[in-house]
Amino acid sequence: MPQLNPSPWFIILLFSWVIFMVILPNKVMNHLFNNEPALKSTEKSKPDPWNWPWL
């Protein structure tokens, strides 16, 4: 039975895991953290008063 011969299947399994563990995490991580969050200022900003034109 040829499917029990581990020679071709083991190398396919090995190369697929190499792709999953080496190449794909780098590509995925490049898309996750492309925007660095900006730090908020500790000073509170004074909000502008609302304009109520109907009163």
Swiss-Prot record:
Which Gene Ontology BP annotations are present?
Answer: proton motive force-driven ATP synthesis
Keyword Transmembrane assigned to the entry: answer is yes
**Protein location:** Mitochondrion membrane
Q: What parts of the sequence cross the membrane?
A: 4-24
| GO molecular function annotations of the record | proton transmembrane transporter activity
Q: Keyword Membrane on this protein?
A: yes
Origin superkingdom: Eukaryota
This protein's assembly is summarised as: Component of the ATP synthase complex composed at least of ATP5F1A/subunit alpha, ATP5F1B/subunit beta, ATP5MC1/subunit c (homooctomer), MT-ATP6/subunit a, MT-ATP8/subunit 8, ATP5ME/subunit e, ATP5MF/subunit f, ATP5MG/subunit g, ATP5MK/subunit k, ATP5MJ/subunit j, ATP5F1C/subunit gamma, ATP5F1D/subunit delta, ATP5F1E/subunit epsilon, ATP5PF/subunit F6, ATP5PB/subunit b, ATP5PD/subunit d, ATP5PO/subunit OSCP.
Q: What does this protein do?
A: Subunit 8, of the mitochondrial membrane ATP synthase complex (F(1)F(0) ATP synthase or Complex V) that produces ATP from ADP in the presence of a proton gradient across the membrane which is generated by electron transport complexes of the respiratory chain. ATP synthase complex consist of a soluble F(1) head domain - the catalytic core - and a membrane F(1) domain - the membrane proton channel. These two domains are linked by a central stalk rotating inside the F(1) region and a stationary peripheral stalk.
Q: What family does this belong to?
A: Belongs to the ATPase protein 8 family.
What is the name listed in the Swiss-Prot or TrEMBL entry for this protein?
ATP synthase F(0) complex subunit 8
